[in-house]
């Protein structure tokens, strides 16, 4: 029953936020009150990292039915620790996917607030951030016309993850650094982001 309630909350959160102006912080508190927090359990961290590896770092989308099943299993398992982090992550992802599917621009206020919460909650639980949070936060800030903060987020992410292709792409787009351009075109010419942004 708890999972049904949380699942419903997850599905409706974007609509609730947009219609009533409820803050993500209040939604998070409802979700977090049902979550078992365990700083030693890396399941959710590993899922976010695997999502990043398969969806963003790989040359092409390598999402597999096995990974999708693993993700769905974690969401539906009442014993999943730190599930509030996974819910925040999926709320953000759902919001972006829904906006793209409807041909609309994502809500930057929702994006930024969700990513700020996910960043602080993930740091609180794990003491560090997976690369995907730096990427999503930079995208959120960029969509909210906070270009300088987005650039600082990308720079911070690259310090932690110097081999991250998406972070290198965003850094190059911000700085036009010739060394980054060479690295991307020589070492990652087939990466979907290099091709999407026409980096040559």
Show the residue positions of the predicted features.
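Terminal, low-structured helical/coil segments at or just beyond the last alpha-helical repeat
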Residues: 128, 170-200
